[in-house]
């Protein structure tokens, strides 16, 4: 996965002129070389989209590690950044964790549709996903995920409901937990607030914004199979 993502990034900054702008008259820049062959192959574009997501789940330095997720509320669209925890390509599932008391989960309870956005500036590639959410609270998946969660991260679920008003700047944590990890007994109280959000991907919109080899493609899931088509960028 790392090699795939790194190679795509290389195509974004390839063969620049001495002035710092792309030299459109440079034959080597215009040819379909090893860095740009994938831009002419839908199956490789699809593989690249999944590589970006998988890399995001496994590497905290990846720009796809913190995608934006948009939901719908009574006041209109709401968007926030989440931490991508798991990608299952075979099942077309993305997973991240959330507080059941927060607006994101509340909104998904009312309307499970969600949009996901991620952008890799080095690779000059954007992903937009259309998804439907399933919420896992208190079940086997939630429990196994909670048990594998870093104790420091569990502190997030030991605070008042997200968005609660405060008279002063606050983390929401009790003073003893401000500077240390909670014990297993202490963190256990947060499990009731813990939720795993599983997003079933129904469509992937992939956009590569290279100055010369600009490309866009969409992949839609139909009867368990992905169908891809080129789009005008």
Regions found by a protein language model. Give the residues of each.
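Binding-site signature for planar aromatic cofactors or substrates
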Residues: 2-16, 22-233
């Amino acid at each position: 996965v790392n090699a795939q993502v790194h190679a795509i990034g290389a195509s974004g900054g390839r063969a620049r002129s001495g002035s710092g702008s792309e030299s459109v008259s440079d034959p080597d820049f215009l040819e379909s070389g090893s860095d740009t062959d994938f831009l002419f192959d839908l199956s490789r574009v699809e593989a690249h989209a999944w590589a970006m997501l998988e890399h995001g789940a496994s590497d905290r330095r990846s720009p796809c590690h913190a995608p934006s997720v948009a939901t719908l509320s009574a006041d209109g669209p709401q968007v926030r950044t989440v931490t991508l925890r798991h990608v299952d390509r075979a099942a077309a599932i993305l997973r991240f964790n959330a507080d059941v008391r927060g607006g994101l989960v509340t909104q998904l309870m009312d309307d499970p549709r969600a949009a996901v956005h991620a952008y890799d500036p080095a690779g000059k590639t954007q992903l937009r996903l259309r998804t439907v959410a399933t919420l896992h609270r208190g079940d086997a998946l939630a429990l196994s995920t909670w048990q594998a969660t870093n104790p420091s991260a569990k502190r997030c679920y030991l605070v008042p409901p997200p968005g609660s008003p405060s008279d002063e700047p606050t983390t929401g944590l009790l003073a003893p937990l401000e500077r240390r990890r909670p014990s297993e007994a202490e963190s256990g109280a947060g499990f009731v607030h813990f939720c795993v959000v599983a997003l079933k991907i129904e469509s992937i919109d992939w956009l590569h914004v290279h100055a010369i080899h600009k490309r866009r493609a969409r992949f839609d899931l139909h009867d368990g199979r992905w169908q891809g088509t080129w789009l005008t960028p």
